[in-house]
């Protein structure tokens, strides 16, 4: 049975970062990307993951080699940090998915697309608020938490959700007062009651992006659109802004 305690336990499990991440964070905060890469480059699973994200995200950098130090420095601190963060979250992923219709490699594909498109949107603003780039990897955390919570239920539940306007988020909200958006807020150290104007704006843009990505033909069958209640009705100006950003 689901309980508030079980929900919080799963959220804490997925968001908990190892001491290795703290070490890397120390280097990145000091602006030392090279040392951060050196700390990770002998970890085979990270090299494979990083390569997979880099190839799929198609970051616009003029380099075709495979030197991690060169790539990371060209990507910049914020983008490299987002990839590292997503890697440690990805390590918490179950190997087999029951709630969502994808394999673990599809999670990497989705992660790469959300990250690269979110970066394009952030790059389109005059003021570059790259601290919000972390929203992208935390979207993967939501998928993992949702899978962990609902995978133990009968498959017929997934069928009901698939053919109705009910979302996993709505179930948790009504039963336990929990929203998957709380994961983003907790991870980003945001307080729902005291969000700044820029916080609200960035969360709104990111919500629109998640709606867009989950409805893409290549991702729609995954079922991730059933995690959150996407209740944004953007102005035409906002839609045009996002469309132009994603075309770059």
Predicted features, each with a name:
Residues 1-8, 194, 224-248:
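Terminal helices and disordered tails flanking the catalytic cores of nucleotide-processing hydrolases
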Residues 1-137, 144-154, 158-222:
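Conserved alpha-helical "signature site"
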